[in-house]
Swiss-Prot record:
Region forming the signal peptide: none
MF GO annotations: structural constituent of virion
Organism phylogeny: Viruses, Riboviria, Orthornavirae, Negarnaviricota, Haploviricotina
InterPro entries assigned to the protein according to its UniProt record, in alphabetical order: Matrix_C (IPR042539), Matrix_N (IPR042540), Matrix_Paramyxo_C (IPR055413), Matrix_Paramyxo_N (IPR000982)
Recorded GO CC terms: viral envelope
GO BP term, example: viral budding via host ESCRT complex
Organism of provenance: Newcastle disease virus (strain Chicken/United States/B1/48)
Protein name: Matrix protein
Domain remark text: Late-budding domains (L domains) are short sequence motifs essential for viral particle budding. They recruit proteins of the host ESCRT machinery (Endosomal Sorting Complex Required for Transport) or ESCRT-associated proteins. The matrix protein contains one L domain: a FPIV motif.
Coiled-coil region(s): none
Amino acid sequence: MDSSRTIGLYFDSAHSSSNLLAFPIVLQDTGDGKKQIAPQYRIQRLDLWTDSKEDSVFITTYGFIFQVGNEEATVGIIDDKPKRELLSAAMLCLGSVPNTGDLIELARACLTMMVTCKKSATNTERMVFSVVQAPQVLQSCRVVANKYSSVNAVKHVKAPEKIPGSGTLEYKVNFVSLTVVPKKDVYKIPAAVLKISGSSLYNLALNVTINVEVDPRSPLVKSLSKSDSGYYANLFLHIGLMTTVDRKGKKVTFDKLEKKIRSLDLSVGLSDVLGPSVLVKARGARTKLLAPFFSSSGTACYPIANASPQVAKILWSQTACLRSVKIIIQAGTQRAVAVTADHEVTSTKLEKGHTLAKYNPFKK
């Protein structure tokens, strides 16, 4: 590839699907002269993306990990309320339930869960959440049904370095994010598909820029880029493959590639499905090479933590909205990427109002 062009995707920044709003911090009295952050919920509806009679509610919880008691003490007073030390904020995705009940009651049920946690390790540092008790309305959630969830600590804990390897740890839910989405729309691309490469292939990448509302004095700005209009983050996502040759064995021109990409009629949005995520919707026809990257209804979900854990954790607490989206065509192998120019394609949609709402519980 000896040239570089861009396919910029159109989006409506005013639409709710282009924004992710943060929870506002609201303090309430505890009755003993102290204050605590009031539990909150938020609801985002993405059921307009696809015509569907069956919607699911994806539940993402945000809360705090506490150490209960002091395991090193050998003498002490027996107390009904042992000391609880705040260690770090954390996120736990519970899974989904059918959208058949009261969403506010569903959020309230999450607050009553009893969850413990501990560290573990495989090839990465893990955090294992154990569900001790959960209301009946949550029993169909994958994590509740399995009684546990083992997750990458860096992606799910704000400050994993603060979590000890022993002692009694408790995860307390404080914020509940509910996303209503057509049942078949949430499709997480298999890792094996994302690793496919070949010299006869082109990789399609999505370069997503997200505006982040943040106080200039916040330490979070150290992880963000700055423009005249504020701060933003960059993400790079692998969204598909295309062949370099046609059925006759002739090399496919960039003009033909751009035409195929535009015919996909792509839309992009922000949501909180598997944590803060970029959602992609292809309304046009998909080739056999592109099929594994989308659900049967043409959707794909990209958890931001997989691309950039740091950016994902910033979005736990800050309002964000889509700034720009570009499709970039790259060579099909990493070696070829290193020695060839990228090709950018301009055009497609950013879904209106995909915003991550004002949460802000987790200032580190």
